[in-house]
Amino acid sequence: MSNIEVATEKGYNKASLRKICADAGVTTGALYFFFEDKEALFGAIADGPYNELIAILKSHFEEDEALMEQPYDAEEGDHDAFVEELVHHLYQNYDVFHMLLTKAQGSKYENAVDDLADILDETYTKMSAKMGSHFGGKVNKQMVHWLTHMILDAFIHMITHEKDEKKALAHIKKVMNFITKGWTAVIDK
């Protein structure tokens, strides 16, 4: 059983370093040589994929913010390349992200969804303000926040309910087209 499997099965709080060491065929002393504690081991598993997720999102947001300099009219498939990259990353690291969403209580990642919501809220508020300036409207921050959670919830549902990457991609593309077309709803005219 791998470290990820132990953490996924038991969750961060209940994952035993002794069990992880026994399954890996090493002593706890050997583990502590490489990792200060369970948090460091968990970080070694999750930090890379999580940080790459943030980098993918930030890169996409930079592109979207540049688009918002001009009036933007959403078209079907506008975000397909981004969605494909994002879904592929999530599914290349499926066990890690499933663990972060369902078994991270007690770890530094227990608030990962809220942290992502904060990043999305900040970015979407800026983009909505730019979009609103083209329509002569004002951003409805509460609607931006709701939309942020709709998007996050769609991806959380995807990871927690669909193990097949191709099926997940087909469904989430439709969801993203729906959400992208609804962005004008966050502007009060």
Please identify what each model-predicted range represents:
Residues 98-102, 127-179, 187-188:
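Hydrophobic/aromatic-rich alpha-helical bundle segments in the mid-to-C-terminal region
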Residues 4, 100-117, 170-183:
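C-terminal/domain-terminus segments
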Residues 67-73, 100-107, 136:
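Short linear capping/connector segments at secondary-structure termini
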Residues 44, 58-89:
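Hydrophobic alpha-helical connector segments
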Residues 2, 6-40, 44:
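Helix-turn-helix
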Residues 43-49, 112:
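Alpha-helical DNA-contacting segments of helix-turn-helix folds
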Residues 17, 47-54, 59-61:
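Short, basic, alpha-helical segments at the C-terminal edge of helix-turn-helix-like DNA-binding modules
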